[in-house]
Amino acid sequence: MNNKFQNIDEITSADVQKESLFKKTVFSIFFIWTYQYIHINYLCEVWSYMRYFKNELDFSQVFLTYIVALFPIYFYSGLKQISSYFSIIIYIMCYVPIVVTLSYNNTDELGYNTVLLHQVVLAFSMSFFFLVDKIKTIKSKRLILNIPIFWFHVFTILTTLYLVYKFSGNMRFVGFEDIYDLRSENSQFSDPISQYLTMWATYLIYPIYFSLGLVKRQKMYLLIGILGHIMIYMISGAKASILMPVIIFLIYIVVTKIKYLSFSQSLAFFVSSLSLLLFKVDVDSLFLFRSIFLMRTLSMPGYLFSNYLSFFSNHPYTQYSHIGIVNSFTNSYPYGDIPIGVVIGDYDMTNANANANFWATDGV
């Protein structure tokens, strides 16, 4: 096996050729409509007690919501660099849910002009993510081509050992009804380093191993990815950690089987189709998976951003003092010893640690 990561241009040149203005528009609108439909007909009906609202919007407000949600995709030009994978996933799994949720959750409370202003700022931010892929310097390319996978293995081993060292006394399997107890118990063992490493392990390290296992047909990589996600679940009770290998596998099947679609089109089609299928097939056996995927995974970025925006509309801003290193210099964190995620969790009455995406925690 090649001991270095391959040049991303050699792998994804065909993907760029599959991108077109028409396909971008059609698949993006399909996904935006799907999420709007799920928000109105599932989230607001089943989970309304968790601050999922259905504000009445007129045609112009709905139209502008679609325009803002659609705008950044025209700056996406296919898989050109490794960052392209992350940017399109952020667009589908984070950006669109945030834009749609803000319109339906916050318009009555904050006024549509305030909501639209935040949506426009997010649109430019997402567009910039896509534009970054076009910035390609000789220095950055050499860096990509000369990072041996050996050092990635070393980083993985050190991360795993540190997490096991920190939480080995309380790592265990729990049912979904007990995950908040597990999180509460393990919060006393956590520190800023373990919190960051847990996020990296959940959304980067072990997904990369599982993905490499699929692409290279390496059983060892698949095993590392699966065991890593199981370990994270035993530490944090994160449902996303258990669901991640399943989602990656399904995306892999869709991308490899639908040859005439690009990665972005396949991902939008897959997420939309799975969402509609889970909603329409109303059987009790799917209730858990439906809630995990539609509510806990797909809607959570928008839900949390909406709650952060609502909370900070009438509470003091942290001015980045929620970041431990910053607060060690400024000592200005306004909520005492309570982490910002817990503060928001108390506000939205879930009594959970509402850690959110960077747009919410560092943007709002």
Regions found by a protein language model. Give the residues of each.
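Helix-loop-helix junctions and helix-breaking kinks within/between transmembrane helices
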Residues: 102-115, 227-252, 363-364
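Loop-centered beta-sheet repeat module
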Residues: 236-298
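Long, hydrophobic/aromatic-enriched structural stretches that serve as scaffold segments
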Residues: 199-248
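Generic detector of ordered, mature protein regions
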Residues: 125, 223, 244-248, 255-256, ...
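Membrane-anchoring hydrophobic segments
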Residues: 1-210, 214-219, 256-263, 268-280
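Alpha-helical protein-protein interaction elements
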Residues: 27, 83, 87, 225, ...
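Small-residue-enriched transmembrane helix-hairpin modules in multi-pass membrane proteins
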Residues: 8-22, 38-56, 177-196, 275-364
